[in-house]
Amino acid sequence: IIYMKISSKEDIINHFINGNKSDLYIGVENEKFIFDTKTQKRSTYIQISNILKFLQSNFGWEKVIEGNNLIGLKLNGKQVTLEPGNQIELAGAKLKNIHEVCAESFEFQDQLIKACNEFNLELLSIGYDPYTNLKDVPSNPKKRYEVMTKEMPKLGRLSLEMMYQTSGTQINLDYSDEKNFSSKFKLISYLVPISIALFANSSIKEKKFCNYL
């Protein structure tokens, strides 16, 4: 991590100016829940490991190992990673337009569905897990999540729910100058509340109605 010392307004402005790019790309990260079709419970680390091994064997992904544990995959600028509650995330490659992003997403989803079918698992593309109690979400051996699980509650009472009970989407956009940045930032500011209402809102929490639409 590179920390930037901020001592003036100009330091902040220069940080964004230094981010100007001539070649503009878009990258999308999205997470998905995996459930066991027999037990209707969230997938365990062992089950997710089987998925990763299947993807590696059948679609050319390379393993990412931490200690003795398989924690992800990589291929052509893309990465598959494990989130704290064994959500699977695709961190996409840098691409030129949303059509390429869409194709990348559907290709990985097709691979993931094939892997899930092999192990009696099911993919669920929603923003919040409405069924599983926080204490019942299976964990995995990634070291950073062990630290985060201890430290995050100090920063917010819903931090563990965010880690273990949500699946998010993150969009990374390059910008060419201040005007280009402003137009993209403005548009995203309009779209995010709508997308949250549509895709990340849940009327059910841990199998009970929670008075949200």
Task: Give the residues covered by each predicted segment.
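Terminal catalytic/cofactor-binding subdomain
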Residues: 3-157, 165
